[in-house]
């Protein structure tokens, strides 16, 4: 590790799910490192074995790969300070915890579950947060050794002072002081020999040379305890960047427990990965200037973590949809068509329909790809529709006028020999000109008959071109039949 090198880490738990908040943490962590040409490290925090989900690692790797957040060190690529999976480092945490015991900064706790349950019940009755009562901190060395020799199960707890205060600095929230009387003696090593998340991440951050720690502000309350661990070991404290939460609305946080979308959910709904990443970057950070459409390279160049907002960010699906639309329009026609193909699948089954023409027609109108099936299904099959759709105040049409228009227009369409967009358009526009009526009087009924829908991508000419001459004539005749009833 080079001296003065910026080193950040993304340290997810393998729970099989990449929450939007987790992805933002990964992104900000990546941007802090890359803005300074530093190293971005992936570490897997799997100390909570009960929450471990099979194949969860694959979700993490796939998400980072898809979003372009390439890690410099990690379980799959190695590096100078591995292993990068906490369960593979299990042995070293106990050694560090024992060092704290020797210094009087931690102690063995042999309390039974029953005793702890009584303490918790008493705390609840007094409406106070649970705080361990330091019962085992008062055991003599001999008593401790006797219990260890007898194989009594134990945990190792941090030994926090009960007087004075602990102060720490955070980039976003500034200097924060906490009364030591509020600090619980948190568990460092669990009875199964595994370290707790709180202990392992401090040890690992030090051993891996992490200079900046990015995490959610729900960890602010734990920061004083982390600081005391750094000080107890005589280690440098990293720069803390506690990010505000991402809210679903004014009252509730975005949460996987409430079924809120994960990154993968958004991709499956038809959002582009670049748009999602761009949108997530702006949930708490605003670059200078008005441009909100930013590539990952732009973000690396512009990102300044000292400008992250303190107030919570609200996840706005409407804004995300708009931003996705901006990215969709930036695609080349070939790129758009390739992405759209799976959404045509099973919706458009007729072989004579040119899907590329549909792609060309809808690209500027699509915001998310999952909108496509409902937008294009009428090309394949004319839906049943109400004749009231022929009434349009602005176009000055109603069922009677529409019936006349379709009847008069049908032979004109039947006589078009070379069926292509230009020919269809020129023939019908010349017919309207000769008729001396407003365009809408003919085109509104025609588009309605051809599509059976109130809103369509493209107008009558484009629809007729795509569905073909025979199908166009068939649909116009259905329209006439409906209007004659």
Swiss-Prot record:
The protein's role, per its UniProt record: Catalyzes the attachment of glutamate to tRNA(Glu) in a two-step reaction: glutamate is first activated by ATP to form Glu-AMP and then transferred to the acceptor end of tRNA(Glu).
GO biological process: glutamyl-tRNA aminoacylation
Superkingdom of origin: Bacteria
PROSITE patterns according to UniProt: AA_TRNA_LIGASE_I
PANTHER family: GLUTAMATE--TRNA LIGASE (PTHR43311), GLUTAMATE--TRNA LIGASE, MITOCHONDRIAL-RELATED (PTHR43311:SF2)
HAMAP family hit by this protein: Glu_tRNA_synth_type1 (MF_00022)
Protein name: Glutamate--tRNA ligase
Catalytic activity: tRNA(Glu) + L-glutamate + ATP = L-glutamyl-tRNA(Glu) + AMP + diphosphate
Positions occupied by motif 'HIGH' region: 12-22
Record's subcellular location: Cytoplasm
Chain sites annotated for binding ATP: 256
Record keywords, A-Z: Aminoacyl-tRNA synthetase, ATP-binding, Cytoplasm, Ligase, Nucleotide-binding, Protein biosynthesis
InterPro entries per the UniProt record, alphabetical: aa-tRNA-synth_I_cd-bd (IPR045462), aa-tRNA-synth_I_codon-bd_sub2 (IPR020751), aa-tRNA-synth_I_CS (IPR001412), aa_tRNA-synth_I_cd-bd_sf (IPR008925), Glu-tRNA-ligase_bac/mito (IPR004527), Glu/Gln-tRNA-synth (IPR000924), Glu/Gln-tRNA-synth_Ib_cat-dom (IPR020058), GluQ/Sye (IPR049940)
Entry's Gene Ontology molecular function annotations: ATP binding; glutamate-tRNA ligase activity; tRNA binding; zinc ion binding
